């Protein structure tokens, strides 16, 4: 095999050592306001799958009655890699919906199921008790509906919480506010959702 000599040190030009790497900070939607909303679909990770497409997000946000107000300060919606204990997340300017497990049968703790029983019933998700929890059997369309109508709305609730505080730095009202926000808007857009995405 032929050996190639590579220069590993930077050049000297006009008596000045040149920088080896680009020192400029690369802007991203995490730290720089974007001219338009970015919908970023990342790899789901091993054992996970994205049931949402970018066009699903675009269609869904078109159903929200106050999107112009809600989208202020929102740079991106991320279809993020899956995590065992996380359905979604928010950080200033960005909300994420995590990929779903490839297995559509999900075990929930009884407390989690009780808190989401109305949403799951509306979506027609079948469930039965198991030891230490409840087994929920989703279909592809039910996963998509749950991620849009509950998880995304919940994370947008955190964003709305942050943007309606005086400082606009952090979401101060926490989980109860985001959960109530999701439940309120799910009821408002339920019929529009069914018209746009079809039945479950």
Where are the model-predicted features located?
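Short pre-active-site segment immediately N-terminal to the catalytic Zn-binding motif
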Residues: 128-152, 165-170
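A metal-dependent hydrolase signature that marks the N-terminal structural subdomain at the beginning
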Residues: 1-121, 129, 133-141
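Alpha-helix capping at helix-to-loop junctions
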Residues: 158, 162-165, 187, 191
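Short, surface-exposed, polar/charged, turn-prone segments marking secondary-structure boundaries
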Residues: 104-108, 123-127, 187-189, 199-200
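Post-HExxH zinc-binding segment in Zn-dependent metallohydrolases
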Residues: 171-200
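Hydrophobic, Leu/Ile/Phe/Ala-enriched alpha-helical segments that form helix-helix packing faces
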Residues: 60-68, 156, 185-189
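Active-site recognition of the HExxH zinc-binding catalytic motif
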Residues: 150-163, 178
